[in-house]
Amino acid sequence: DQLPWAPRIDLWYNSNSMRGTLPPKFRKHATLDEIADDIGGAYYKVVPDFINVRSYEDNIDRGIGVYRVQGMSYKAELVGVERVVKKEGEATLVTYLTPIGSVSCKLLYTEDMKQGGVSIPWISEHVIKEPNDYKTVGYIFKNMKVHPDYSNYLDFQRNVGDKGIAVTFGNSAGSPMHHIMKDFLDATTFYYEMYDHPKEMRELCEDMEPYFDQIFRILADSPAEVIFLGANYDEMITYPPFFRDHIMPHLQKLAGMLHPRGKLLLCHCDGENKGLLDLIPESGMDIAEAVCPQPMTKVTISEVKKALKKGKVTIFGGVPSVAFLEDSMSDEEFEHFMKNLFREIVPGDRFILGVSDTTPPDAKFERLLRINEMVQQWGQLPMKF
C-alpha cells in the first residue's frame, strides 16, 4: 500500500487554460483530468465543478447558497417563489418574489476573476439587507422542495471511475446558522446581526431546518460513499463556541445518519484550525479535508495528527499552496519543507496527501511532479522515513 496523493489543481487549471499558459507539453485544450493523469496520484473530486454548468439553473441561486451542479445527489426546487434574473454588465441581479415580500442579491463574475481561475461568482450584494428580509428568505427555504438526483451523481461517479473517490456535494455550510453566515450576510455584518436581531436570525434558522432535513435524508440514502458538508471552518470566523453550538450538532446529526449506512462525512477545513482541534474529533466528521499547516497557519501536521487521532479523523491535505510558489519557497526550501512533512506524516495511517487549499495559478508545475516522485519514493505504508 502507498500513501494516497490527490492534488487539487482546478484553480491552477482554470486560470492557466483561460490565459493560455498551460505547460508547453499539454495541448491548448487539455482537460483537467488529462493533466491530473500526467501528474500522477488520484483524481481530486471533492469540491464540485462550478464552471462547467449544464444550464444557468446550476448556479443561479448561488446568492442563497443553493446549487444544482454536476455530481450532486439532490436537486432543490423553488416553490411559491418567482425568480427574476437581470444581467448588469459583469454582474447578475437575482430577485426572489414571494407572497410576503421580495429579496434580491447580486452576483459578480468578472474577467479578472476568470483569469485568476475563480470558479464561483462573488456575492457583491447580499440577500439580507434589512430585518424584514429574514422572513422572506425564511419563506423561500421553508417552502423549498428537495428531490433525489441520484442519476446526476452516478454519472459523475462513472466518470471518476477507479481514479479517485467521487465525493457528493451536500452543502457548503454545515448548518442553517453557518449558511446564513456564508451566504446571506458578509462576515462582519453577520456578527452585528447576531447581536442586533437574534430573534429574526433564530426564526430563520428554524425556517431552514426542513431544507436541511430533506438534504440529509437524501444524502443518507444516496449511492455516494463520501458526503461533503460544510466548508471554510476557521478559529476566528467560526470561533470555537460558535462551531460547537451552531455547526457541530448538524454535523453530528448527519454523521449519525451516514455511519450506520457505511458512509463517511467529509468537511472542507481550509482555515486556521488551531482553536478547533479539540472539537473536530467530536464533530462526527470522518475526513478533515484541505487541512493547512505552517507557514500558512499556526499548526503543524504533527499537532493536527495528535488532536484528530482521538476521533479517528482522516487528514486530507498537508501541502500549503505557498509551497508551489517560487517567490514563497525556493527549490531548496521546497525540498526541505516536503521532507519534513513526510517525516511528520509517518507512519501514514489516516492521511491523504493533498494541497491546502488548492494549487495556485502561478504554481511551479514541476513541484507537483516532484511530490508524486516523493510519494513513490517514500510513501510505502507503513512509512519509515
Cite the ranges covered by each PLM segment.
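Segments that shape or occlude catalytic/ligand-binding pockets
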Residues: M18-A76
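Residue-level preference for well-ordered alpha-helical positions
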Residues: A36-D37, L97, K305
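Compositionally biased, low-complexity repeat tracts
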Residues: N16, N59-D61, Y67, A76, ...
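Active-site loop segments of alpha/beta catalytic cores
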Residues: D1-F26, A30, K106, V127-F385
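Intrinsically disordered, low-complexity N-terminal regions enriched in serine/proline/glycine
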Residues: A42-Y43, S55, V66, T95, ...
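Generic detection of intrinsically disordered/low-complexity segments and helix-coil linkers/edges
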Residues: A6, G20, D37-D38, F50, ...
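Glycine-rich, aromatic-flanked loop segments that form ligand/cofactor-binding clefts
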Residues: P4-I9, Y43-S55, G71-P121, K145-F184, ...
